[in-house]
Amino acid sequence: MTWMVKLLRQMISMQSQYGAALGATCLLHYLTTSLSIRFFFHDLTVRKHEVMPLGMDYYYLYAIGKDPSHPEIRGSVRKILEKYKTKADKANCALALEAISEHARSVYEYFGFKTYLVFQFGVGEVNSKGEPDPQGKGFTAYLMLYHKDADTIFHA
């Protein structure tokens, strides 16, 4: 089983067992023990700091998701994003996240996020749908940032 499949299974398991907050914390631990640590916690951080002004604080929104077995529950992503956008606007700080699909990217764009890095994820482990494939090309992911004054203070 590849690390990506393990990661996705771990995320579903932890979120259904313990709720999203603890699930995300457990996922963070799992992710830091995988081979992707350099990319997620170094390369993406470097790009965030290239875009944002030196010393700018930011909230990192990690593992936002929805349980597909409950399509009747709507608006949870909106509540999370609106709450953190309000906090960030008041504190004059940014929001950062990674979108792992075109759909997620379009949702975040609707809420004012912009893409600052496009990258391939899971190459040689999964196909474009995230299914295990040792010859897989992985899938495209996006580093996205939000700030109320992004157009004037962020460096593209």
UniProtKB/Swiss-Prot annotation:
Regions that span the bilayer: 20-42
Gene Ontology cellular-component terms listed: membrane
Gene Ontology terms: biological process: mitotic recombination
Keywords linked to the UniProt accession: Membrane, Transmembrane, Transmembrane helix
Location, primary (coarse class): membrane
Places the protein is found: Membrane
Membrane topology: Single-pass membrane protein
Disruption phenotype: Displays increased levels of spontaneous RAD52 foci in proliferating diploid cells.
Extra remark: Partially overlaps YOR012W. Disruption phenotypes caused by deletion of this gene may also be a result of a defect in its overlapping gene.
Designated name of the protein: Putative increased recombination centers protein 11
Natural source organism: Saccharomyces cerevisiae (strain ATCC 204508 / S288c)
